[in-house]
Amino acid sequence: MTASVPESASAASEAATETVEGTVQSVVYHNDENGYTVLTVAAPAAFELAKGRTFTLVGKTQAVWEGEDVTAEGQWVTDKVHGRQFKATAITCVAPKSVAGIERYLASGLIKGVGKVLAHRIVQTFGERTLDVLSHQSGRLREVPKLGRTKIEQIRASWHANETLRDAMIFGQTYGISVNKMTKIVRRYGPDAVAIVKANPYRLCRDLWGIGFATADRIALSVGIPKDSPLRARAAIAYTLETEAEEAGHCWSYENNLLLHAHELTEIPVEILGEALEQELRERRVVAEGTGEEGRRIYLYPLWLAERDTASGVRRILGSPVPFRAIDADKAVAWWEARAGFHLAARQREALTRSLTDKFSIITGGPGVGKTTIIRALADIYSARGLKIVLAAPTGRAAKRMAESVGRPAQTIHRLLKWNPVTNRFTYNAENPCEGDVFIFDETSMIDIRLARDLFAALPSAAVVVWVGDTDQLPSVGPGCVLGDFIKSGAIAATRLDHIFRQDTSGLIVRNAHHVNAGEPLEVRPGESDFYFVRAEDPEQCLKRTIEFMTTRIPNKFGLDPLRDVQVLTPMRRNLLGTENLNCELQKALNPTGDAVVRGGTLFRVGDRVMQLRNNYDKDVYNGDVGFVQAVSAADRSLVVAFDGRPVKYEAADLDELVLSYATTIHKSQGSEYPAVIVLIHTQHYVMLQRNLLYTALTRGKKLVLLIGVPFAVDRAIQNNVVQERRTSLAERLVQTSRVDGKGTETK
């Protein structure tokens, strides 16, 4: 029974649940993440409204198109701003039955290449049977006047793809999966997507980025998979290991802890989880090593492989001779000093000598200690010998800074390895090594174990390799502690530079970074400086001052562009002073108007600064890359982002790979350097306040560092040098193997 829609109603009637029907006239708003939808609906003649009269329908549904018939359950309400509307608790959309509805439906953008004119011709030809013809007799499209073969094939393909997607969307709506995620599922599994997911929902966690255990588990329990199912137990084991890798950076977990955490997650008995673990071991999805009080070390197979292969790659390079005549280091250093017009410090000379005589060496130290000088010297000396020098860094910003400071071309490690989308692997690998004689890598503290594996697989055995980095910064975002493990192993020659060169009488950025690293108080001077501390006691005041400095005070005083030159850094994503809220508020202040594409609660506008959240090899864009929105299309909810001037298109389903980046976490800023940074440090961030976090933040600023927050929080961070050790075995793997002397000869 369909309820009438009265012109006025009492409060009591507004509270009653009713059912309304109609035809979608327009989709005013639709959020692909949570399904929130605002529709303009034409009421049918059976309603007490006049025929054709429209009303506003608000509720949650998945994909919806103009012309569809809609049925909704809910209540009539009066919104203070938008007036009378129907607030639905359930919305069901079905394909239209009337000729007018079908024509509007086809012209809504549902079918690629079909607009109003062509939709009219198709419906004129087939009438009320149009949708049946498209589904079951698409060959009859030849009967439509002036419709060529190519267009017919385009319509057929688009229609059948949408049928698959519509079935998937209905499934997604039932189990609370967003349109964007369902689109990715269909893209991954094809026309059998729903059947595949029903058979094993947990494969979603493994196959698709952005879909976690909670979503897969909800689907699994809803389709009848038992709570103590081996399928569920195995998924819990994998998810627990993946969570520890991605959130804590661990490469392995103790067996007892793993089973305990998986039990806490699922309430599955430990005995069943233990059996599931053994099955995962048999199928080589996980690997076990060693024994101890806490049980075996359990690795996800890819992380175990990454550690093993990285160690193997290092041994291969250390154990292989160079193909060129050995360099006389003393003469080479003297030659370079005469050319440069100054003498190196003793520790710099030591670092340079090691890098000229050892196959693989490491140079570490904080800001201003002369690391770049050594890179420049190495490049000059090796180039003078006619050798090919390759400079690379983990991120685009780090590579650009390396090129500018050294005066030679540099690239990202991903572009050095060159992803091949056809083979779905890097072009340069163990079978096809990179071309070059000397490979120098900067900002290596950012390199995680997976990237290290790919890198060392692709380096030629004869290569000379130099890693440069700062072990006192935060470790890599991804799992592992590669630079630290290399040094810890003692298998690779490492030199630590500690004398500060890059400072003058007025510069406090470098000085304060070293103060923090030594556990000492900050220096703050009145008057002109490159380092300031602004006290803000409560989070609201801290937010207000951040916006004030970002939008007016820094641009006015220092002439810096807030969009391109100033970066806000904060320890966390959540809370008032987390990146999510900061980006929302800073966007309102810096880029408040213009056409926008919506994803979840985020608006993307032309001019917005955005960051990529994952490696997307097909787009040649990588985790942490920063770009600017160049164009938006509200019609298909796509946008174009310029990364270093290169345009990259994002479809609606890809938008979850992007976030606004007016503010970013300190960890995400690693490897980048900005003309100015605003660092928020408050007791709201208490659990994150650590020395290496503050040190990393301060070393991101080149010309200006502005600290906003509470003195107690600053002191807490400086004094808290307790760093959680990452569970890795790379150092052990390097120590346990046959030792080499670093010059290409093995020692027994």
PLM regions and their residue ranges:
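Walker A (P-loop) phosphate-binding loop of P-loop NTPases
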Residues: G368
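Conserved helicase motor core of P-loop NTPases
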Residues: T471-K619, Q630, T737-S738
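Conserved helicase motor core of SF1/SF2 NTP-dependent helicases
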Residues: A377, I381, R385-L387, A393-S405, ...
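Accessory, non-ATPase domains that flank or precede helicase/AAA+ motor cores in DNA-metabolism machines
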Residues: T2-K331, K748
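N-terminal pre-P-loop "Q-motif" helix
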Residues: G341-T357
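C-terminal accessory regions
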Residues: D625-K748
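Hydrophobic anchor at the beta1->P-loop junction of P-loop NTPases
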Residues: I363, L391
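Conserved lysine of the Walker
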Residues: K371
